[in-house]
Amino acid sequence: MISKILCLSLLVAAVVADQVDVKDCANNEIKKVMVDGCHGSDPCIIHRGKPFTLEALFDANQNTKTAKIEIKASLDGLEIDVPGIDTNACHFMKCPLVKGQQYDIKYTWNVPKIAPKSENVVVTVKLIGDNGVLACAIATHGKIRD
């Protein structure tokens, strides 16, 4: 019975957070990006007023004591900084980072209820270290809905 529950839990976890297709906008440091409820190159639906979880596996390209998260969204061609995010990446992964080592960051934030609906959302996420960009990914298949 316990093994059946464990198998079901693993299956649900695999369905909820699947790897998504992203474009690397740095030097191929990003190894994998997973977003709750999003799969491959299918459009990723972001719901206003709901939490949104992003997890990324990347290789550090530098030694750094600190790391900052920068998230920008392009809504129908208009680029904005995503409001209300905690920009200290060290709150979501262990710092300092060592060049050449692989790290996992899991970040959750609430999408503002006032976010405009859009069927054409491009999200750019950058991790910035003491010496510049650590990793960068662009997701091009987003939609914002209720």
Swiss-Prot record:
Disulfide bonds join C25-C136, C38-C44, C90-C95. InterPro entries: Ig_E-set, ML_dom, NPC2-like. It comes from Dermatophagoides farinae (American house dust mite). One of its GO terms (biological process) is sterol transport. It comes from the Eukaryota. Residues 1-17 form the signal peptide. The keyword NADP does not apply. Keywords: Allergen, Disulfide bond, Secreted, Signal. One of its GO terms (cellular component) is extracellular region. Belongs to the NPC2 family. Pfam families: E1_DerP2_DerF2 (PF02221). This is Mite group 2 allergen Der f 2. It is found in: Secreted. The sequence shown here is from clone 2. The N-terminal sequence (AA 1-8) from clone 1 and 11 are not yet known. One of its GO terms (molecular function) is sterol binding. The keyword Signal applies.
